[in-house]
A protein has these predicted regions:
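Bacterial Sec-dependent N-terminal signal peptides
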Residues: 1-31
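Cationic-aromatic interfacial patches
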Residues: 26-169
Length: 583
């Protein structure tokens, strides 16, 4: 790869020199050539001129393309002598089906290229137009291949996204052009995304396309946040039934206007299938959240699928390996994987919109048992200082100590009204124990945002439907099960190491006031109780973790799921996807 990049660097210097020369010869007598006897030198000169007019893109694809042409004496890539359009036709055929990936063909100049191609077939193009065709086809070819392999949008442009992903480089460009020369059809077929998650979403998109032309009457929003109770009548019930019949949750009934006047159990069952699919609260009432989800057009659901197809095209720079943890912030869940199979699943609490959980990739390297909590400055300034103005007992009740320059001080001696963003000299530390906000276990991983996974002393928060309530860290529902997942998976024959791991697990259990369960743990507790206390455990190996954001995905049961765009990231990505256009 280093040699390829150095080669491209040298070529770019030569190409720049060539492109800076005058092109008066190209501009003279630019007429329709004799297609049986094309002047190769004139065509190459026209291509050189056309490349000099090409705009540089921030992602460097343009300069890579220029360098490829320059390193091959500006020979045409797609215009074959004698004229043969098979390769361009092949590429256009793939681009005509780009809708399965969430884009429109003309975003890649499909109509412009098609017109130029037809003129080529009719031998109507001048040398300069032949050059335009050749370079434009190269540009859309690279954009198409790069988009499918790495994504059409670089996620790094989004403030919330902090994961490193693979990017186009000179090696990829060389691979594309070499494939174009020898096995284009095979290469275009192989570069299509083939993961199970991607193909499953594409299949579901096909299903939703079947619903696009279906007409249903929008359901009126309920006034004053009222709800429709099970067993009651309401004018919207037939409309709700009709909408569920279209998408298949409720069997079709041509007499629905008279069959569904009351919110009955049959409708409830269908409605809860829909609510499960869209991440809504499952209950025996119909509220405005459900009505709003029912009122979304099928085109809007398709758009959500398209946005998440793009997310699936983003390939992490570092492989997650066979054992890893994935937090889907939008779904507010954590799944732990072994060999791409979910081994452990749980609810989590994530950051509210103004304190969003950062999307990143890292590795859990350490477990902290009975952690203390150093309160972030933002919480001191925006929350605790305001409470402390009125309630000095807050600190004692919540086991929080206050320090100034390393010395513990009495919080009642502080004038909390003077705490501002420019004046906050105090360090607040909450004692470890069952009352600690981090609970009994913390999972540390490197990141610049000081976020981590942790247990919680407020278990009720994990029973909420909307769990986007934290200051950015992730509260986990099953901390002890997650601890067990973090231990190495060893075969039973490794008796000694398994016994050591069982003992370590029991030390953690004992340290958080749970009973030990292994034979080794019971013996150690009896012979040396002090040895059973542990406050930190460094993991070996580290466990990869990815904080992700998927608002549409296929669950382990193979069912499509939609989730609220809690951080408004779908809309930002959709704007970028709609703006794609190859000039």
């Amino acid at each position: 790869m280093r040699h390829s990049r150095f080669f491209f660097f040298l070529i770019s210097l030569v190409t720049s020199s060539l492109l800076s020369t005058t092109f008066s010869q190209t501009l003279l007598s630019d007429s329709v050539p004799d297609y049986q006897n094309l002047n190769v030198q004139k065509l190459e000169s026209s291509i050189r001129f056309e490349l000099s007019q090409m705009n540089f893109n921030p992602d460097l694809k343009s300069i890579y393309i220029k360098n490829w042409y320059g390193s091959h004496n500006f020979q045409p890539v797609w215009i074959q002598i004698p004229i043969n359009t098979f390769k361009i036709d092949t590429l256009l055929n793939f681009i005509s089906h780009i809708g399965v990936h969430g884009l429109k063909p003309d975003q890649l100049n499909f109509n412009i290229i098609t017109k130029l191609l037809n003129d080529l077939k009719n031998e109507m193009l001048t040398y300069s137009q032949l050059a335009v065709l050749d370079t434009k086809v190269s540009a859309i070819y690279i954009q198409y291949c790069a988009g499918l392999k790495y994504g059409f949008i670089n996620p790094g442009i989004f403030e919330a996204y902090h994961k490193s992903v693979q990017q186009v480089d000179s090696v990829f460009i060389i691979t594309c052009f070499k494939a174009q020369k020898t096995h284009l059809l095979n290469y275009l077929s192989r570069i299509q995304p083939r993961t199970k998650a991607y193909l499953s979403l594409q299949a579901e998109k096909d299903n939703y396309i079947n619903f696009v032309d279906s007409v249903f009457t929008p359901i009126p929003v309920l006034a004053n946040n009222q709800t429709i109770k099970l067993g009651t009548s309401h004018p919207s019930i037939p409309l709700i039934a009709r909408r569920l019949m279209i998408s298949g949750e409720l069997p079709y009934d041509p007499m629905y206007l008279s069959s569904y006047l009351t919110f009955n159990y049959k409708l409830l069952k269908a409605l809860n299938i829909f609510r499960n699919k869209t991440g809504l609260l499952i209950d025996e009432e119909i509220g405005n959240n459900t009505i709003n989800a029912l009122n979304l057009t099928f085109a809007e659901y398709i758009n959500k699928i398209d946005v998440n197809l793009e997310r699936l095209r983003w390939v992490p720079l570092t492989s997650l390996g066979k054992k890893y943890i994935r937090v889907n912030v939008a779904d507010m869940t954590l799944n732990a994987f072994k060999n791409d199979t979910v081994a452990l699943s749980m609810k989590v609490c994530v950051g509210r919109q103004k304190n969003s959980t950062p999307l990143l990739q890292s590795k859990i390297f350490e477990l902290v048992i009975n952690p203390t909590w150093t309160v972030p400055n933002s919480i001191i300034i925006n929350e605790i200082a305001k409470i402390a103005m009125k309630d000095h007992s807050y600190f004692e009740r919540n086991h929080i100590r206050v320090y100034l320059q390393g010395e513990e001080i009495d919080p009642s001696t502080i004038d909390w009204t003077k705490i501002t963003i420019n004046h906050q000299p105090y360090k607040l530390v909450q004692d470890s124990g069952s009352a600690n906000s981090l609970g009994r276990i913390k999972f540390n991983f490197k990141n610049p945002f000081s976020v981590y996974l942790h247990d919680t002393n407020a278990k009720g928060a994990l029973k909420r439907h909307d769990r986007a309530i934290s200051h950015g860290c992730v509260r986990v529902e099953k901390p002890l099960e997650l601890v067990n997942f973090c231990f190495p998976d060893l075969k039973p024959v490794y008796v000694t190491q398994n016994q050591k791991n069982d003992l370590l697990k029991d030390k953690i259990r004992h340290s958080i006031d749970l009973k030990v369960i292994s034979k080794a743990g019971k013996e150690a507790l009896k012979s040396n109780p002090k040895s059973m206390k542990i406050d930190r455990l460094r993991l070996n190996p580290f466990i990869p973790i990815i904080m992700d954001y998927k608002t549409c995905f296929i669950n382990p049961k193979g069912k499509i799921q939609f989730r609220n765009d809690i951080y408004s990231l779908d809309s930002l990505l959709n704007i970028q996807l709609l703006a794609i256009h190859q000039h």
